[in-house]
Amino acid sequence: MIGLIGRKVGMTRVFTEEGVSIPVTVVEVEANRVAQVKTLETDGYAAIQVTAGTKKANRVNKAEAGHFAKAGVEAGRGLWEFRLENGEEFAVGSELTVELFNEVKKVDVTGTSKGKGFQGTVKRWNFRTQDMTHGNSLSHRAPGSIGQCQTPGRVFKGKKMAGHMGAERVTTQNLEIVRVDAERNLLLIKGAVPGATGGNVIVKPAVKA
């Protein structure tokens, strides 16, 4: 399914004709350039590889420079891939713009969530805190028991404990497109999307729409 690579600009709001305020996230979608077309014959699956944005020449390594030069496209800030469905065809060097979403009502947005560092169970997993008084003087935010005794004699995998929080791939589904601004290459999406301001996001037509 073809999507677009964008950059999260921030949040604002727009008003309907009735005066209702709608919170929106502004996603800047510069033209996505096709850097490679993968086919069943050569790669075993059909897909396109795209790049977006720009990258300083001194930040492009030789492998990347050769890859972009072969495609005849300007080096971008990364490479992303979209699987092709039956009948879809694209040429190397062609561009995908925000107009791809002119007829789309709902989208799925994927980004990297904000990193929170090492966090305890209360913040990371919404555990309840223990008593602030009534004889408890040390274990207010402690997780409590993490398992049994000699049987099984270990902590089960997946146990919710303190650890690194955030900085992981997150997808928010079924977000509504409020406006497509082709002139300024902007998508206005209702609500919040994952990640920090300036982060890369992948916008695709919603799979559950």
Swiss-Prot record:
GO biological process, one term: translation
One Gene Ontology molecular-function label: rRNA binding
Record keywords: Methylation, Ribonucleoprotein, Ribosomal protein, RNA-binding, rRNA-binding
Recorded coiled-coil stretches: none
Highest taxon of source: Bacteria
Pfam short name (any one): Ribosomal_L3
PTM note: Methylated by PrmB.
Residues found modified as N5-methylglutamine: Q150
GO cellular component: cytosolic large ribosomal subunit
InterPro entries per the UniProt record, alphabetical: Ribosomal_uL3, Ribosomal_uL3_bac/org-type, Ribosomal_uL3_CS, Transl_B-barrel_sf
HAMAP family: Ribosomal_uL3_B (MF_01325_B)
Complexes and interactors: Part of the 50S ribosomal subunit. Forms a cluster with proteins L14 and L19.
Family listed: Belongs to the universal ribosomal protein uL3 family.
Function according to Swiss-Prot or TrEMBL: One of the primary rRNA binding proteins, it binds directly near the 3'-end of the 23S rRNA, where it nucleates assembly of the 50S subunit.
Name of the featured protein: Large ribosomal subunit protein uL3
Source organism of this protein record: Vibrio vulnificus (strain CMCP6)
The encoding gene: rplC
